[in-house]
Amino acid sequence: VGTSIEITVLRKGLSKAKIFKIVREIIEITSVKTKLINNEIGYLRLTAFNENSSNQLKKEISKIEKNKKLIGYILDLRNNPGGLLSQAVEISDFFLNDGEIVSTKGRKKRDNRKFFAKEGDKINGKPLIVLINNGSASASEIVAGALQDQKRAVLLGETTFGKGSVQII
């Protein structure tokens, strides 16, 4: 970040090269898009589970929660290929007060883990619908499954991709 590089470009038909200086910056990928439907439904679109997804979603939910007419939420996980397990756990926890979110089973017993929700449903118990399709994979399936298993959300859509797994590299 902050470092620069100079690129010299010689265009066809021109005799003089042009020099461009490019400075590196942090690029934050936005994986959360939100809107209010009819001023009463919070629509949360999650396109991936990257390292900033939970922070972005938390910020957007707190903005939407200020609306006094809000009656429920739609969490759209369609065509979300997944991403980081840690983000799937944090995002699931936003909508749960307790219960198991997911467990992982490794080749060695010490790699087996269980992840549980902490108290504090960020949407205060409002109804939640989760949209899924065959493009919902991996972390998307973990979130959808956890919310369904805990009877916290209704899933609507198609059968998911069927990955529902975690790889550690």
What does each model-identified segment do?
Residues 1-169:
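Cleft-lining beta-strand/loop regions that shape enzyme active-site pockets
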